[in-house]
UniProtKB/Swiss-Prot annotation:
Mg(2+) 1 binds at E126, E155. Its EC number is 3.1.3.11. Substrate binds at D179, G180, S181, S182, N287, Y319, Y337, Y339, K349. It comes from Pisum sativum. This is Fructose-1,6-bisphosphatase, chloroplastic. Keywords: Calvin cycle, Carbohydrate metabolism, Chloroplast, Disulfide bond, Hydrolase, Magnesium, Metal-binding, Plastid, Transit peptide.
């Protein structure tokens, strides 16, 4: 029961006696009549009045003002505005479908025995998790079936892969299908990262009828060169975080938008628009287990963060070990995320093409900054698909501060 008016009236959305009341009516009971007649186990007729449901519903609509915008409808709006074309809408929709499938796989990983390693090593020399392999297949298949993707490059593939001619489109999509998969067994946040580059007809290989291999060979190196574009050429980028909720964060070069997966309807719903990162923050996110491997300037920077600042408090350390999870927190609350070069990984550990560049595109659209410590990440020209670079990303003031230490 819920109070309807100040005169102590009670509205029942379900009548106690469906056989006696029209299903298209709401019954309003006078509270005093109900209470005084409760001992007789029935309600006096004088305490009941009915009104049509349609009338009450229209009043509710006027009061609520709720409007749900799904990712699909939002993309169509951007298409109507001329910001993106129909082809890109289809590619982004196929990526969102892949993310829904991966989200389901991640949530059921322990139940479906999908935790642990696959028993293989990827091009990075890393042990592949079972879900690394499956997520890569899911992502690749969704992009192929879209009919709008020409070339895809993945963390789990040695080289760029051309989509079969019968399904081939033009867009170039780079992605990390499951970032942070080493945390999967512990049910820690993971995610998928992607970037989309503009089409180039010259890049599409011409397969002969006798070709049964769609992996680019030496004769199609021009396609690999075309995939290796600087992040400044990105048309769209985003990530999907699989955590207590599933968040799909997207930019098409006109701000950053956050969509949350509604498990009831299976749709991504717009929950934040034109997200802006704070200009500064008091959270730093570095893996300090590598502290002894860092150069002295970086050590000095980290040491200074631990001293009381203008607020009288030192910075807080937060580190999940998942780029998507750590970046998402930084995007919301401000601060800095860093994965520097060290004595073991002289070029850094994160991949430029499908990790650093997409994230830097997102953070810049949110008013932040992405740097390798000396230059803007989006200005770096990749020389190979799996090229690694150091990364410092987050609030503009925080990134500029670390750049001064490293200069």
């Amino acid at each position: 029961m819920a109070a309807a008016t100040a005169s102590s009236q009670l509205i029942f959305s379900k009548p106690y006696s469906p056989s006696r009341l029209c299903p298209f009516q709401l019954c309003v009971f006078d509270a005093k009549s109900v209470l005084s007649s409760s001992r007789r186990k029935h309600v006096n007729g004088s305490g009941v009045r009915c009104m049509a449901v349609k009338e009450a519903t229209s009043e509710t609509k006027k009061r609520s003002g709720y409007e749900i915008i799904t990712l699909t409808s939002w993309l169509l709006q951007q298409e109507q505005k001329g910001i993106i074309d129909a082809e890109l809408t289809i590619v982004l929709s196929s990526i969102s479908m892949a993310c829904k499938q991966i989200a389901s796989l991640v949530q059921r990983a322990n139940i479906s025995n999908l935790t642990g390693t696959q028993g293989a090593v990827n091009i990075q020399g890393e042990d592949q998790k079972k879900l690394d392999v499956i997520s890569n297949e899911v992502f690749s298949n969704c992009l192929r079936s879209s009919g709008r993707t020409g070339i895809i490059a993945s963390e789990e593939e040695d080289v760029a892969v051309a989509v079969e001619e019968s399904y081939s489109g033009n867009y170039i999509v780079v992605f990390d299908p499951l970032d942070g998969s080493s945390n999967l067994d512990a049910a820690v946040s993971t995610g998928s990262i992607f970037g989309i580059y503009s089409p180039n007809d010259e890049c599409l290989p011409d397969f002969g009828d006798d070709s049964d291999d769609n992996t680019l060979g030496t004769e199609e190196q021009r396609c690999i060169v075309n995939v290796c574009q600087p992040g400044s050429n990105l048309l769209a980028a985003g990530y999907c975080m699989y955590s207590s909720s599933v968040a799909f964060v997207l930019t098409i070069g006109k701000g950053v938008f956050v969509f949350t997966l509604d498990p009831l309807y299976g749709e991504f719903v717009l929950t934040q628009e034109n997200l802006q990162i704070p200009k500064s923050g008091e959270i730093y996110s570095f893996n300090e287990g590598n502290y002894k491997l860092w150069d002295e300037n970086l050590k000095k920077y980290i040491d200074d963060l631990k001293e009381p600042g203008p607020s009288g408090k030192p910075y807080s350390a937060r580190y999940i070990g998942s780029l998507v999870g750590d970046f998402h927190r930084t995007l919301l609350y401000g601060g800095i995320y860093g994965y520097p070069r060290d004595k073991k990984s002289k070029n850094g550990k994160l991949r430029l093409l499908y990790e650093c560049a997409p994230m830097s595109f997102i953070v810049e659209q949110a008013g932040g900054k992405g740097s390798d410590g000396h230059q803007r990440v989006l200005d770096i020209q990749p020389t190979e698909i799996h090229q690694r670079v150091p990364l410092y990303i987050g609030s503009t003031e925080e990134v500029e501060k670390v750049e001064k230490y490293l200069a």
